Amino acid sequence: MEFSVSSYRSHSIKTVCILGGSKLIGHIQHVDMAYQFVKELEKYKIDILYGGSNYIFLGYLLDAAQNERTNVTSALNYPTVRTSSIGGSTGLMLQAQSVHDNLIYMVNNSDAFIVLPGGYGTLNEIFNITSWAERDFHTKPIGLLNINNFFSDLLTFLDQGVDHKFISQPSRDILICVDTVADLLIKFQAHISVKNLEVKAHQPQAIGAKRKRSLDPLDLSL
């Protein structure tokens, strides 16, 4: 897989990528969350690309989507995982060569990101896709679903980065954080409306593409 992210083009949200950790919050809460995702996204005919590592939650998403018109695709980065791992539900399961390839695939094949609580792997994904957005490698909105105020302390940490001049305010504002999927979709549409107005004046470079200024291209390979 090539280490490049597609350049920006005017678009609406057709596919949302869901990221999150592998640990279960609780059976009932996960089932309710899966149905909430599918219910809200189906209203706008938005499909789901699941990039998380919780295969049980993936099964819940697939089950919730069975009676709806929402398509659920799973981007998996462990070739040993089989369909039986998520029960009897069916869905397209993709297997990339590495975690890095997997993340690039998700950026290239989704129009927005919704991030659930998670650990180091989830934080790594958040900061990768946010830093790529900061450098204009993509302009897709990134939303943190702040379940039980999980991301509140992270946002305080980032605000401290702004105070100490390590993070600019526009870069800090890349991350959207709200409590519900419905509110995230509203924020996403507003974000895309602004970016669509900017597209003619600003064309981001693809990752690895040579810039006009005399700097070496950014190498994101691992």
Report each predicted region and the residues it spans:
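A cross-family phosphate/adenosyl-ligand binding-site feature
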Residues: 2-109, 147-182, 193-222
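Basic, gly/Ser/Thr/Pro-rich low-complexity segments located predominantly at protein N termini
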Residues: 25-26, 56-57, 123-126, 141
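Proline-rich low-complexity regions
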Residues: 77-80, 117, 141
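Active-site/ligand-binding-proximal alpha/beta "capping" segment
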Residues: 100-136, 143, 194-203
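Hydrophobic "lid"/C-terminal helical patch
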Residues: 188
